[in-house]
Amino acid sequence: MKRMRALSLLTAVVVALPVLAVAAEVPEENFYPTVKQEAGWMGYNSDNSIAYSKPSSLYAMVNGLRGQMPKEMYLCASLETKECTSSEIDAFDFNAIFTKCQSGADTDCIESFGIKNEDNSIDLATFERNWVPGPVFKGDRAKFLPVGYGPSTWTLTSKSGITETYALSVGVNGYINLRNGSGKANYESFLAAIQPIKEVSGAEYIAGVAQVTKRAEGYGPGWNTNFIERGCQIAENGKCGYRLPFDLEKTYVLKVRLGQPVQGWLHGRMKDANVIMTTAADNSQVVEISAKPLSIPSVYGWVKWSELPTAVKELYPVGSGGTGRGFNDFLTPDLASRTLLTKSEVSGDYAIKEMNLWLPLLNDKAAAMRTFWVAQTIRGELPLESQNCVRGKGFTGVIGTNAVVYSDGPPKFDKAEQSLNYTVGASHLDSKGELFKGYYQLNLRSDVARCLYGFGSAPIQAKIEVSSSDGTPSVATTVINEKDGWLKMTAGGFTFSTPSIKVKLSQEAPATSAAPAATPAPAAKPVAKKTTIACVKGKTTKKVTAIKPTCPTGYKKK
């Protein structure tokens, strides 16, 4: 497991070039932490936007099977690149950014992008170009390897004549195992990131380019972040797609064609998300996502290595990933002389633990608030006894939240509590020092919910409980409905740092009438009767009427 953790960190190995701007001079939307240039510091950065600007890349690896540290690694322009055809190569890793679909038969491309109006009509954007001319690497249709391009820009002109430009980084990450016989690409994740931008020019802007990075135990992928640190969402040499804030009330619609279907869960920075997936006979898939963007805290700060608690130091051994002043910061065994800015993962127990350890050191406050529209797949699994409910079902559900970090994978099904449990985490305060209010959305396929709970066809009822890390209830506004084969639940208005969300589903058995029978008729089974109980909390009394009434959280039966 330690090796796998190390390998995942390799994807975040970047070297920062000095940037003169300081946070106070930069609008919050363009804020991105810069790396200290003096020795002996450790920085925390929760902002995961670096992952949304990852360039297209195709790597060939020796000893590159999953869970191993590659002994050798090469950048490839295609599967036929000389260094990438060696008999020692046992795997390829790729990140393929899509361009616009050119014909109805194309896959692994963007079909359309636009904004949904109040009457549900859609204003479609115009594709302008891919940044970075030409394909970054060639695909191979026979092996299901997509072509890798640079990110694209699209324009929308309003009725008042105002033109807006958007940067789209939409694509898939995947893997080719040459030792398992098939030698064909397998899509491991799907990512779609949209951002309003304006184009600016300057010699200081450098395109994000994939690199091979030497590590203490081998090699790993990496890329430069110069343009991100300068407030750009995308870049090419001499040009920057400078980030602009979203209108949080607009609903953006993205339609993508994939050569392989999305599996599991879709999660990300989405509000009021609705996802439609259509799979064709050839196993290709059309994914349509409509959602509003969200404002997310960026938690960031530096502490001298010598002043860090031991529990924090233990998270960053020699070879840890992040952004350093140079490659020596990744290799040196003298950790007190190293300066490293960690890049938090967006999900998982490790990410939640890491942020919880840093928040007290950073006053539990965001350094900036930035807007995002991001959707990506996540592969986490349910417990063994529940996996039959999702195995082979393809797309299972949607999770949208404004939390900085959150649980990895789908909500965990607690059989004893009969609840779906999820943990989210963020700073208690926003960048202005005001309480940051949480948002959480769960769309769960109705057939999956019925399987998990053993429900019949009657309508499902749900209850959302939000409690703080110490177990006390948190005030939240919840909305629940079942429609078109989906159970949709949202919770909002709760506060952080790491609240736990529990979704409890229930279903009342439908009343049945006695069937006709010969005389004498047997006695009909009694219909379940509702009863009323009184519940108290301090001086407040509530009456609850149900077949099996229970008191709300915080109340006791009188």
Regions found by a protein language model. Give the residues of each.
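Solvent-exposed beta-hairpin/edge-strand motifs
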Residues: Q102-I110, V132, G454-G471
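Secretory targeting and sorting signals
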Residues: M1-E25
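Proteolytic processing hotspots in large secreted/extracellular or virion-associated proteins
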Residues: T401-A462
